[in-house]
């Protein structure tokens, strides 16, 4: 996207200009991935110019408008500092989920390592699937589980396996445990298969998740 194209989207509806106008989160991420530091500066300019909001706006009709300022901040941090620039935001509970969203779209070994580092300190005992730890594990699942995923060394795959094993143990819900099983698809193959096959599962959802994970791991042999 060109600079003037983003500026035009920010200057028109349908959303109020303080909520980004017609700018979508995906626009900001693509823009900063394409334009780097210069793109980050432009995002910061638009955020200041239109006073992009920090908080959700909830309307009487039950709809809501998402805040654009946090996305602008994390995109700008990445544009100026790369993956390392997002580290302070990962450490900020108010910004972590936004930083995780950008890291997922960066799709690099460095972004995988940043997510693993975040998860290493995370508590997976929360039941909320939108919590930062769950979002980070879901991002790793997206980045590492499929044919066109990020290629990482075996040591990283082993770190992922240790992570999903801990997430499995801590998760209080079937949904959380199933996510851990799905994420094992990107782990070191032989060890992940042995672990999955050792689990005594009864819930239909988790049995199905294990089946999917084992199928993918066999494809990677």
Where is each model-derived feature located?
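Amphipathic alpha-helical segments within extended alpha-helical solenoids and repeat-rich scaffolds
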Residues: 47-53, 115-122, 157-168
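Repeat-mediated protein-protein interaction surfaces in helical alpha-solenoids
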Residues: 6-10, 51-53, 80-85, 160-164
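N-terminal leader/linker segments that initiate helical-solenoid repeat arrays
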Residues: 1-23
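Structural detector for internal amphipathic alpha-helices that build alpha-solenoid repeat scaffolds
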Residues: 15-37, 45, 56-78, 84-88, ...
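Alpha-helical scaffold repeats of the Armadillo/HEAT/TPR superfamily
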Residues: 154-163, 198-202
């Amino acid at each position: 996207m060109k600079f003037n194209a983003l500026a035009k989207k920010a200057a028109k509806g349908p959303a109020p200009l303080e909520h980004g106008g017609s700018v979508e989160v995906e626009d900001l991420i693509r823009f900063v991935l394409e334009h780097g530091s210069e793109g980050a500066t432009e995002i910061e300019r638009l955020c200041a110019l239109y006073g992009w909001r920090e908080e959700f706006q909830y309307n009487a009709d039950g709809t809501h408008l998402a805040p654009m300022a946090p996305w602008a901040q994390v995109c700008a941090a990445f544009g100026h500092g790369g993956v390392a620039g997002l580290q302070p935001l990962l450490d900020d509970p108010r910004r972590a989920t936004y930083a995780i969203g950008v890291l997922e779209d960066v799709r690099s070994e460095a972004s995988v390592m940043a997510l693993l580092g975040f998860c290493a300190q995370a508590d997976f005992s929360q039941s909320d699937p939108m919590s930062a730890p769950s979002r980070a594990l879901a991002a790793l699942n997206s980045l590492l589980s499929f044919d066109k995923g990020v290629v990482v060394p075996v040591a990283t795959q082993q770190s992922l396996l240790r992570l999903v094993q801990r997430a499995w143990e801590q998760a209080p819900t079937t949904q959380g445990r199933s996510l851990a099983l799905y994420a094992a698809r990107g782990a070191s193959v032989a060890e992940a298969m042995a672990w999955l096959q050792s689990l005594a599962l009864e819930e239909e959802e988790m049995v199905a998740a294990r089946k999917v994970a084992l199928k993918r791991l066999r494809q990677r042999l």
